[in-house]
């Protein structure tokens, strides 16, 4: 129960800070923001807020499952190409029944892939995927373990790229 409360508190804190993220970002800076829930694989919800600023990358992620599994971390790399973004992050906290299966341990890395298909109801749904944990930093950019191929059932992601 305390872990679930922690997850909800973290998600709320990130949600409160997300609008401030647009203050950090100015035109010409890559960013990925949003929250989405998959309607499969246990219905996880992934919140991502990563903004490349002149001072460096800011942001993080929270992934939470209804069964209490969660992972929280800080963004280490943001890669944007068109309407698709990949965020590599280092996990700072995790727990729950899927922690071992997903290899989500503090200090390990995860890659989250998102495809922004426009505002909900205007095109197909945004797409999402995330990797299992990596013991070493997998690097920056597209990762086959996180290719965004699964549609979200609720939520919205926004991808902004420099070019």
Q: Where would I find each of the regions flagged by the language model?
A:
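Positively charged n-region of N-terminal signal peptides that target proteins for export
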Residues: 1-4
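Bacterial N-terminal signal peptides
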Residues: 7-19
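Sec/Tat signal peptide C-region and signal peptidase I cleavage site
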Residues: 19-27
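Predominantly extracellular/secreted and cell-surface proteins with exposed
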Residues: 38-114
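Acidic, low-complexity intrinsically disordered segments
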Residues: 117-120
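C-terminal partner/receptor-binding element of secreted or periplasmic proteins
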Residues: 122-163
């Amino acid at each position: 129960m305390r872990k679930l409360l922690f997850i909800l508190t973290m998600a709320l804190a990130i949600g409160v800070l997300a609008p401030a993220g647009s203050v950090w970002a100015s035109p010409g800076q890559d960013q990925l923001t949003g929250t989405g829930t998959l309607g499969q694989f246990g219905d996880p919800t992934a919140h991502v807020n990563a903004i490349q600023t002149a001072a460096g990358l800011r942001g993080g992620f929270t992934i939470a499952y209804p069964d209490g599994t969660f992972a929280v971390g800080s963004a280490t790399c943001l890669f944007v190409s068109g309407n698709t973004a990949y965020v590599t992050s280092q996990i700072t906290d995790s727990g729950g029944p899927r922690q071992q299966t997903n290899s989500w341990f503090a200090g390990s890395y995860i890659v989250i892939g998102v495809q922004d298909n426009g505002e909900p109801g205007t095109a197909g749904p945004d797409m999402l995927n995330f990797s299992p944990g990596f013991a070493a930093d997998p690097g920056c950019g597209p990762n086959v373990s996180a290719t965004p191929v699964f549609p979200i059932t609720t939520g919205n992601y926004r991808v902004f790229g420099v070019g």
